[in-house]
Structure formats: C-alpha cells, structure tokens
Amino acid sequence: MLRSLHSAATLSNKRFYSLISHSNRKNIIKKLLRHPSFDPIRHHLPEDITTIDPYSLSQNVIESLNKLEVPKKDAAMVHNMMIENLSDLDYGVATIHSNNLRDLDLKPSLPAIKQIIRNNPGRVQSSWELFTQYKASMENVPDELMEVVLEKIIKFDKAEKVDGKKSLTYQDLVRCLYLINHFSSNYNLPSELVEPILIYIVDNGIPNVLGSVLKYKIPLSFFDKYVSEMTQYQICELYDFYSLDNIVADPLVLHKCLTVLGENEKIQQTEEEKEIISKLEEEIDIVKSQCHDNWSLEFPNWSVRKTATSFEELFLEIQKRNIDKKDFELAHKLLRLIGAFKGKVSLFFKLYDEYLLKFKNNEDDLMFEAFLTLCCQGYKSSNEKMLQYAEAFIKEDFDSKLESKIQSVLIVANAKANIDLSLKIYNSNISTAKREKDKYTDLAESDVLTESLILAFLSRDDADFARVIFDGALGEKLISGPTAAKKIKNLLAQYGEALETKTSKQVMQTKIEHYMESI
C-alpha cells in the first residue's frame, strides 16, 4: 500500500529540514509536471499546483496516486522524479517519496539516490550511512554515486557543520580512501575532491596513503605550498610516486627530496606515525564491516627506507642535466650533503672546484663548506691532520657571520683531540663576539660560542666544567636572553638523561656531528 497522507503529515511534523529559498522554484515545478510520468495524475492536481511549496506538492501528488490507484511501476516513476527534482528545495520531499518507494518494495533510481545523499542534512542518518544502506542492494556501485558520497564526506553534512565540525577525521579519511580505491581505473575524479584529502594527509603527518590518492593525476606542483610541512616519510612516498623528470623539474620539491635523502641514511616511521597507522587500520576494519567488503588498503611494504640508492639516483640526474650549475642554492646544498653528511671528500673537492669556476661571487660560502667538510670528517674519524688542513680554507676577510661559525666549528671539532685548544679559541673570541641577537634565531654570536664550548666539554663527560662555563657566562652577561639560556639548559638536561643510561659521551659526540652538519 502507498503511504497514507496521515503518515506523511506525521513525518512532516518530525522533519528537521527547512524550506530552501529558490527564485525559480515555480519554473522547476512547471517543468517537472510536464514530464510524461505525471500524465496519469496531471489533470487531478489543483490548478494552482505550480505556486505551492514542494512539500504541499508532494501531498497532492501522493493523494492523486492513491486515489487513482496508479500502477506500481508508473507510481515509482513519479516518486523518483519528485526526489530527483525537488530534494534540493525541500529535503522532506526526498524522505516522503523514498518511504513511499519502500512501501512499494522498490528502490529509488540512481539519480534519486544521488539527490537523497547530496541533499541529506545528516541529522537523522549521515550520508555515509545512507550510502552503505543503498550499496548493500547494488551489485556494482556506480562511480558517479561514489563521487557524490566523497563530496559529502569532504564538505560535511549540514548537521556536522551546525555542530561545529571544521576538519576531516581519520574515520573520514579511511572512508574517502575506500571510495577512491573503488572508482573505475579510468574514472576522472575532479581535483577539487582529491586536493582536500591530500591537504589533510600532509597537515596530519599521515604515512602510507599518499600513493592511493596521487593516482588521480595530481601535478607535483600542487605540493609546492606544502612540501616544507611534509614528514620525511611522506617525502619518500612523493619521491617514489613521481618520475625523476617530474622531481627535477620542480625546484621546491627537488630541494626537499635532496635534503631528506641526503641527510638521512635511512627513513623510518616514528612512534607517532606507527600510532596513526594503527588507528587507520581500526577504521579500515570498521569500513570493511559496514560495506561488507574484503577491501584492504595496500600500505607500502617498508617501515624503514634506506636512502643511499635514491640519493645517488637523484644526484646523477642533477649532474646529467647540469641543474646544479644553474642554481647556487642547490650546488651549496650538494656540497653540504656530500661533504659534511656523507664524507665523500674526493667527490666533494671535485664539485668544489667546478663550483668555484661557476659561482665566482660565492667563493666565501664555498670555502666555508670546504673548511666544514674537513672539520666534520676530521672529528668523525679523529683525524687531526684533516682539522689542520681545514684551516687553510679560512680567509682573513670572511664576514663576521661566517667568522663566528668558523670559531664555533673549531671549538667543537677539536673537542676530541685537544679540548684545551677549544677553550683557547673560545677565550680568544668571546670578548669580540657580537651581543646583538639574530632576528631569525634570537641568538647572539656570544650565545653560539658559549653553547659550542659547553657542548665540547659535555662530549668529554666534563659536566662540572660545562656548568662552570654556563654560570660564568650568565654572570658576565655573555648570554643574550632567555632563548639562549633555555637552549643551553636543555643541552645540560639531555646530557643528564644520557648519563643515566651511560651513553652520555656517545650522545654528545653525535650532537657535535649534527651541530656541524646543520650549522
């Protein structure tokens, strides 16, 4: 039996949906009623039918269908047409006519289902819940329906907005990934539906899922705005997905990939990333249950990624295209990575000679890199001769900023072999070190020199003298402010923690290496 008008009226009293203002509502209704499916009832509708609101129109249509005992198939066409054309004016129309279809033991048409989900306010059932209900009766879910559902997840149901929802959740992400993984291989998904998912992934440092979304032809340039925020793990995913041609053609991504692959021998998931994966797996199980599907997300089969091969591949591509000869920042970065980080001294000096000829205005920066490479590798290998060779690259007319860096490096580089020399260098330079703070680091040259000396003595397990240095610097007002003081206190605290595990010397020596690599 068709649902009675009494039931429809009761439903009307319960509905939470407001009538949407629509300037051409009358024209929409006129056009709708001219459709052949309304032929059996058209002459039984009131003459002013085009002027009434959609909900009242539904009441009149249902009354006519009941009175005229219109055949089931023809009535279904009318119900579907009402849903397809009027749901965006008043969602109550979709509710009434979908219930009538259910009473006829029929399902809404695909266009009707799309309108039901598209306009669902989400207070009674979420759009995802509606989707899973309709999906259960479908052998194959059409791409166009999944696109509507994806859009509702990304843009939120109206009820979610009213309740203050501002961003996606892990639950939303997994539902999006489910839909994305079920689109036909050749389906052209609009970028405006893909990009918000990528932004959420980047903003929340989510590993393992970029590849599933990137298959929808997102240009690498999309990440230019976000590459600085991406985790090391995500950068590796990006590098693995795009071709070398794409990577080297995008300067921002190229620099970031080079940095991540060059500074780290391996990239491994952090504890936070492992926790995120665990939460995603929980949501995947829920979606599988809701959708009665054995779907699983194919995560990359590595949790630890060695970088040597990828770095070598990228370096050779840069060399082949002479990109480093046109970009000093890139050339400078390569010298730091190959020299200080990787210790390939012969290759470093080959590049150094090439860059001296190519970038004649940047001689000071290049000479500093040569000095730093020899200091860094001399310290790592306990090679005093390297430290002596390093001083050959110190010019008398270096600017004060480079000069300050040089003294700081010499203080820590000599910590293993000659700590007295480290102290001598500090005492010779601290009185002339600038006290003005750098606007980016909030540290003065005197802060950096003092921190270097304290680190040098901590690497020798001489915490007592390190504290004497700190107290003396505070007393002599060599510490410029709270930023520097806090930084040194943190260093002393890290030493204390390492001392408890009997790894203090190793930890502080590693800190010296990182200090020189990143200065």
UniProtKB/Swiss-Prot annotation:
Subunit structure comment from the entry: Associates with the mitochondrial ribosome.
A GO-annotated cellular component: mitochondrion
Taxonomic placement: Eukaryota, Fungi, Dikarya, Ascomycota, Saccharomycotina
Domain of life of the organism encoding this protein: Eukaryota
Function: Component of MIOREX complexes, large expressome-like assemblies of ribosomes with factors involved in all the steps of post-transcriptional gene expression.
Localization of this protein: Mitochondrion
Protein name: MIOREX complex component 12
Keywords of this entry: Mitochondrion, Transit peptide
Residue range of the transit peptide in the UniProt record, numbered on this chain: 1-35
Record-annotated membrane-spanning stretches: none
Additional remark text: Present with 3280 molecules/cell in log phase SD medium.
